[in-house]
């Protein structure tokens, strides 16, 4: 059952988005979705798609992500990909949604759901940026940026500001964090969901 589920049995869906701007409220949209589903340290599913946001991509965003208007010209709209993405997330009472700086990605996904009049599932959301601050000290890392953590945990994929690469890097960071949490006796999903306080000082 969920109440005793060990983290090694938990399915985590690690998501990263690229977007056309900083906030949905400013008219920005999703340009790319990358998601990796993992359980017990194994990748059991991958979701990747470009999304046509219906707005032009600024030179700044193209420079940051390498994504151009031409790449998105024939891409599906968020309305076309959203149902299959929600299906990929899986059952909300079992799977955990993970993102680095989760409020950003989840904010865009919730805005898309609202715009499409699509029910947003109530998955537990784990933010690797926040979790890293609980298990690491300033002596370990200078900041909790994805690239810094990916290097610290020896991630096999380097973040590139492309959705799937960043999601894969976040998977390795998540696994590193879970290993650290085990050292604090946190091994089950209910314990994981309750991690709210810093576990290390400094």
Where are these regions (language model features)?
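Conserved non-catalytic scaffold segment of RNase H-like nuclease domains
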Residues: 1-123, 143-161
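Acidic two-metal-ion nuclease catalytic site recognized across multiple nuclease folds
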Residues: 1-7, 152, 171-202
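Short alpha-helix plus adjacent loop in nuclease-associated cores
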Residues: 114, 126-142
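Beta-strand segments within the central parallel beta-sheet cores of soluble alpha/beta enzyme folds
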Residues: 124-127, 189-191
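Conserved glycosyltransferase catalytic-site signature
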Residues: 128, 163-167
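Short glycine/threonine-rich catalytic loop with a Thr-x-Gly-x-Asp
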Residues: 138, 160-164
């Amino acid at each position: 059952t969920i109440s005793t589920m060990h983290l090694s049995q938990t399915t985590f869906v690690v998501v990263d988005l690229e977007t056309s701007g900083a906030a949905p409220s400013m008219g920005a949209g999703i340009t790319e979705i990358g998601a990796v589903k993992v359980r017990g340290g194994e990748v059991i599913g991958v979701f990747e798609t470009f999304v046509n946001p219906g707005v032009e991509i600024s030179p700044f965003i193209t420079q940051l992500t390498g994504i151009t208007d031409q790449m998105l010209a024939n891409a599906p709209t968020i309305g076309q990909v959203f149902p299959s993405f929600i299906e990929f997330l899986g059952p909300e009472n079992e799977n955990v949604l993970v993102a680095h700086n989760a409020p950003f990605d989840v904010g865009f996904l919730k805005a898309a759901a609202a715009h499409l009049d699509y029910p947003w599932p109530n998955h537990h959301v784990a933010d690797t940026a926040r979790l890293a601050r609980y298990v690491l000290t300033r002596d370990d890392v200078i900041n909790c940026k994805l690239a810094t953590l990916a290097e610290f945990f020896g991630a096999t994929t380097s973040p590139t500001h492309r959705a799937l690469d960043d999601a894969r890097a976040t998977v390795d960071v998540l696994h590193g964090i879970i290993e650290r949490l085990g050292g604090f006796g946190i091994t089950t999903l209910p314990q994981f969901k309750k991690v709210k306080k810093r576990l290390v000082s400094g």
